[in-house]
Amino acid sequence: NNVYNIQILDYNNTDYSHLTESDYVNCIADINYCVKTLIEKVHFNENKSENMNIYISSIKGNYIMIYKNNAWQIQDKKEQVDDLYEYNEIMLTNWYQEYMNGISSLE
């Protein structure tokens, strides 16, 4: 009988450190779904349970639950999903620019 205590991270403190170069490259290779793929790798990754700080009980519903300030909070789904998408799009763009600059400096 194993007991696992997982401390869920605050939505604003989501950990991206587990992502490897390969993870980012795979996201970018997914072309039309690159941001969605990144969100899945970060927030819906069973190997990184502490990042599972988003809960959508119904795809058709108007609300989403996020773990923030040590409690689950009900938020407007459209607004939160738009913010989540935008933030992860920026993360992916920043990683790509740094990656390309690193390649350029090697040439």
Give the residues covered by each predicted segment:
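Extended amphipathic coiled-coil helices
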Residues: 1-107
